[in-house]
């Protein structure tokens, strides 16, 4: 998850990162 988050952060697409984590947690 952190790797994807990191890659998305580099693209400055934090929303996608947050959405990915949210989906993974099932919230």
From Swiss-Prot:
The keyword Protease does not apply. The keyword Disulfide bond applies. One of its GO terms (biological process) is defense response to Gram-negative bacterium. Trypsin inhibitory activity is stable after incubation at pH 2 to pH 10 at 60 degrees Celsius for 1 hour. Contains disulfide bonds. Homodimer. This is Trypsin inhibitor 1. It comes from Jatropha curcas (Barbados nut). One of its GO terms (molecular function) is serine-type endopeptidase inhibitor activity. The monomer may consist of two smaller chains which are linked by at least one disulfide bond. Keywords: Antibiotic, Antimicrobial, Disulfide bond, Glycoprotein, Protease inhibitor, Serine protease inhibitor. Inhibits trypsin (IC(50)=1.25 uM) but not chymotrypsin or papain. Has antibacterial activity against S.enterica ATCC 10708 (MIC=5 ug/ml) and S.aureus ATCC 25923 (MIC=5 ug/ml) but not against B.subtilis ATCC 6633 or P.aeruginosa ATCC 25619. Has no hemolytic activity against human erythrocytes. Is not toxic to mice.
